[in-house]
């Protein structure tokens, strides 16, 4: 493991052939197989900031293919093992029920997991887990249903299960399904797709501010703001402006240059361009960001509140620092010209991070060759694939996806599977915290943790208090709500709300608190009383529009808005950018309410599936200096009520290659014929047509079905040349 060195010096050494330990031990050689490294050897290939080190917590065979991790109240680590994910280049048997959720325990507190049990066996690619007070919530690939698993005899193996929330089947690409299961400050359980309210063991679903808000992973900060990411949308941190449940805003959130990754592994195994080949194939834009967390640990006071996001293609982890002005946040790379953690090991594939109960930063590393789902990993050249070229930004050379397959096969990467490591990052000279025993503690003991310096302890204690439903904790919570610790005052109020014990007096006192964070939380908590037009709350809010803290004032506006009275804030604080952005959002929503019913249903499909590349406004999402996908708002195929024959073909089979002479960053519009019904595809077309082209008609499922039948035998995506022959 190496401490940070100046990137300019590193780049110069690379070009001069002076870096001796690239990719693995030895010089870069594109004609050899890359060796599999031991955890200790792999750690030596990592760079982290000076004064910090990486430790191995678990590795194969104790853990295999770790795609997601979560701690329970006693510090045990639950791991989703994707034992069928891309076990070969053909994704053979990928949906076979042989994956697992395993439970790892550090029995002696030395920082190494030493006991493993298979908590759940023989399942399909578990995507998310949330260990609670007496159960573990789990979601699996191919379904949105959430299950509750119970370990009645506490032997580390689940004994029974029940449905916590029954969802629909989800046969979309496995990289675009449900993810999350995060207990938030407002006592909702958040996923990337929706929020859930805990109700005595069952879950009640609620929407986010729009459809799917994140791809794989979800994080929260001290004040309940979510940090989202898009893999295909090349965005490690977005939509972090407002607490969960409020509008997701289409505003600029990042500093110039934020989207440039700074990896050090010169392995050209990504297909869609974005490589600086002159710099040994260094990735120039994000492509697979996922697994984010927010650092909320006293071990890292200098980074507290920053977020981490994994980039497995770039073999790096980005740390994002947030600055706030007039209540609006901006994301910055915390290490300009570098990254928080990066590796030269070809098989280092970080996919998930957690801020742990001991205060350390935990990283789940799939440690494998292929991190591309089969849909975007063709292995043979067909006539349709001949046009699937993407342009390298620096050399203007063409490379095909199939050529990428042959490269990685030559390097031996296709056969590196069934490994996996879990690391933790710790500071030199500082002791990690003790392991918790919350599952064995009384409610009174849990209340004391609400003022803990580690955010993980506060969140877990609040979750356990609310999910237990023990109203005997209410007196202690009231005392903490009036105490000296800011975090304690906030969490105690939210715990009281979750237990149905919050009183108006505690809300009104919080609205006058010396801490802006307590005032903001109390304004949010006041919304039920405001909706009932409680005179005391109306009077208190009326005097808070001029709060010196811009985030508090913004929350006051949101409270009036939630009660259907945004006019009560009219003419106040015009300098607040988020207030203006929410008003703009509401104006746009008012127009969408006039859409047809099929278009409104299609909007959900669009926001869950298409928005990460085509953008909320239909103008395309920009990554580095290129759009990921063409602007639908300018599509000639959608003009004049649309060419359904062409549009349905694109949705069903996908489209590849340049469009109008432009090579878009995503490279391929994926086929949707297997994942979406004729009705869903008709509705998403209707939404896009009405939204950006003024269509006066709805596309029918029958129209899509006819095209589906006509092209049933076709293999591979369409090219622009193909579609020209079909369209006018």
Can you annotate each of these PLM segments?
Residues 584-607, 617-624, 628, 636:
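Electrostatic cytochrome c docking/interface patches
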Residues 24-445, 456, 464-466:
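Beta-propeller domains with acidic blade repeats across secreted/periplasmic ectodomains
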Residues 433-436, 456-469, 487-501, 506-512, ...:
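Structural detector for internal amphipathic alpha-helices that build alpha-solenoid repeat scaffolds
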Residues 483, 619-678:
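Gly/Gly-Pro-rich "capping" loops immediately C-terminal to redox-active cysteine motifs
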Residues 453-454, 484-485, 514-516, 548-549, ...:
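Short inter-helical turns and helix N-cap capping residues of alpha-solenoid HEAT/ARM repeat scaffolds
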Residues 427-437, 498, 528, 561-600, ...:
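Post-cleavage N-terminal segment of exported redox proteins
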Residues 26-33, 375-376, 583-597, 664-728:
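Flexible coil segments in periplasmic/lumen-exposed cytochrome c-class electron-transfer proteins
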Residues 364, 422-425, 602-617, 669, ...:
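The canonical Cys-X-X-Cys-His
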């Amino acid at each position: 493991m190496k401490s940070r060195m100046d990137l300019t010096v590193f780049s110069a050494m690379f070009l001069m052939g002076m870096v001796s330990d690239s990719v693995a031990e030895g010089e870069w050689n594109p004609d050899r197989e890359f060796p599999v490294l031991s955890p200790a050897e792999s750690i030596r290939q990592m760079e982290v900031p000076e004064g910090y080190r990486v430790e191995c917590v678990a590795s194969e065979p104790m853990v295999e293919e770790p795609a997601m991790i979560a701690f329970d109240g006693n510090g045990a680590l639950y791991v989703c093992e994707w034992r069928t994910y891309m076990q070969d280049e053909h994704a053979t048997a990928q949906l076979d029920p042989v994956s697992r959720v395993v439970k790892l325990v550090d029995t002696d507190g030395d920082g190494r997991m030493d006991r493993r049990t298979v908590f759940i066996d023989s399942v399909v690619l578990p995507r998310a887990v949330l260990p609670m007070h007496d159960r573990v919530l789990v979601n699996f690939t191919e379904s949105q249903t959430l299950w509750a698993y119970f370990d009645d005899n506490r032997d580390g193996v689940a004994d029974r299960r029940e449905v916590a929330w029954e969802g629909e089947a989800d046969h979309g690409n496995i990289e675009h399904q449900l993810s999350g299961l995060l207990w938030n400050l407002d006592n909702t359980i958040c996923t990337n797709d929706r929020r859930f309210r805990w109700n005595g063991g069952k879950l009640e679903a609620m929407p986010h501010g729009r459809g799917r808000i994140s791809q794989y992973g979800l994080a929260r900060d001290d004040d309940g703001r979510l940090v989202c990411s898009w893999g295909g949308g090349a965005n490690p941190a977005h939509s972090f402006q407002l607490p969960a449940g409020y509008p997701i805003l289409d505003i600029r959130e990042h500093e110039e240059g934020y989207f440039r990754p700074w990896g050090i592994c010169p392995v050209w195994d990504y297909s869609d361009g974005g490589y600086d080949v002159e710099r040994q194939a260094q990735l120039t834009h994000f492509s697979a960001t996922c697994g984010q967390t927010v650092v909320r640990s006293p071990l890292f006071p200098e980074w507290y509140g920053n977020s981490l996001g994994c980039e497995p293609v770039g073999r790096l982890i980005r740390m994002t620092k947030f600055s706030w002005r007039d209540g609006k946040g901006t994301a910055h790379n915390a290490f300009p010209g570098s990254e928080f953690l990066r590796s030269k090991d070809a098989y280092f594939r970080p996919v998930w991070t957690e801020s742990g109960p001991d205060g350390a930063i935990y990283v789940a590393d799939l440690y494998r060759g292929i991190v591309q789902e089969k849909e975007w990993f063709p292995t043979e050249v067909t006539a349709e694939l001949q046009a699937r070229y993407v342009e390298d930004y620096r050399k203007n050379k063409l490379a095909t996806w199939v050529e990428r397959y042959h490269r990685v096969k030559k390097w031996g990467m296709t056969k590196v599977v069934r490994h996996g490591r879990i690391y933790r990052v710790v500071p030199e000279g500082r002791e990690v915290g003790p392991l918790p025993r919350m599952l064995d503690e009384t409610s009174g003991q849990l209340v004391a943790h609400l003022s803990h310096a580690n955010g993980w302890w506060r969140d877990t204690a609040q979750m356990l208090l609310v999910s237990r439903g023990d109203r005997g904790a209410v007196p202690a919570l009231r005392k903490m709500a009036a105490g000296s610790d800011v975090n304690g005052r906030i969490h105690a109020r939210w715990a009281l709300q979750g237990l149905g014990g919050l009183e108006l007096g505690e809300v009104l006192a919080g609205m006058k608190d010396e801490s802006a964070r307590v005032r903001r939380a109390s304004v949010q908590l006041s919304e039920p009383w405001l909706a009932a037009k409680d005179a005391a709350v109306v009077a208190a809010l009326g005097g808070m529009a001029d709060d010196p803290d811009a985030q508090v004032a913004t929350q006051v506006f949101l409270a009036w808005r939630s009660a259907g009275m945004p006019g009560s804030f009219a003419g106040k604080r015009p300098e607040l950018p988020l207030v203006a952005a929410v008003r703009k959002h509401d104006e746009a929503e008012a127009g969408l309410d006039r859409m047809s019913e099929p278009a409104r249903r299609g909007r959900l499909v669009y926001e869950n599936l298409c928005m990460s590349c085509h953008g909320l406004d239909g103008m395309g999402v920009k990554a580095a200096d290129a759009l990921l996908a063409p602007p639908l708002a300018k599509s000639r195929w959608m003009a004049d009520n649309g060419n359904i024959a062409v549009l349905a073909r694109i949705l069903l089979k996908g489209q590849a290659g340049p469009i109008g002479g432009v090579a878009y960053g995503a490279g391929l519009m994926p086929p949707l014929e297997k994942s979406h019904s004729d009705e869903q595809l008709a509705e998403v077309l209707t939404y896009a047509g009405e939204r950006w082209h003024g269509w006066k008609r709805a596309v029918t499922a029958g129209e899509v079905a006819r095209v589906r039948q006509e092209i049933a035998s076709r293999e591979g995506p369409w090219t622009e040349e193909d579609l020209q022959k079909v369209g006018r």
